Amino acid sequence: VVRVNLIGSFNVLSRAAGAMAATEPLDEDGQRGAVVNMASAAAFDGQIGQASYSASKGGIVGMTLPIARDLAAVGVRVNTIAPGLIDTPIYGEGEQSDAFKAHLGQSVLFPKRLGSSEELAFMVMDLLTNPYMNGEVVRVDGGIRMPPK
């Protein structure tokens, strides 16, 4: 889990940043690109049995600011999103899946539902297009704080 989630994210970011750094600046500030990493609410609220997953996502959170500082010299911004419960195919389909998702949604502060992939994509777009957003971790989770189990 750590190899794929953390080391894989670091390796992809390193390659992408190297390619971005080799390009001409996109604007008068000297920006050459932006990276948005994906962590998880588990980085902050890991549940029982999730130690390696939480550590892998916590590592992504932890590397965000130092890498943003490193890449500032070449005009590359770095931010991270820590999604909560997002409605994806991982939950399956059908009546039983819908009931499970509704149950999970009740643990969200507001709105009492799972987030949508579109809502997550909106945040990705915000982080990519706002030139003053750098070195930040943004939770897109409806205010949920996961219980231990």
Language model features with spans:
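Alpha-helical segment proximal to the catalytic Tyr-Lys
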Residues: 18, 69-70
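Catalytic Tyr-x(3-8)-Lys segment
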Residues: 98-118
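Active-site helix of classical SDR
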Residues: 13, 56, 64
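Catalytic Tyr-X3-Lys loop
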Residues: 1-11, 36, 60
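C-terminal substrate-recognition "lid" of short-chain dehydrogenase/reductases
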Residues: 116-140, 145
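Active-site loop immediately N-terminal to the catalytic Tyr-X3-Lys motif
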Residues: 45-51, 74, 112
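Residue(s) in the substrate-gating loop at a strand-loop-helix junction
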Residues: 40
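Short, small/polar-rich loop/turn modules that mediate ligand/substrate recognition or access, typified
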Residues: 72, 77, 134-136
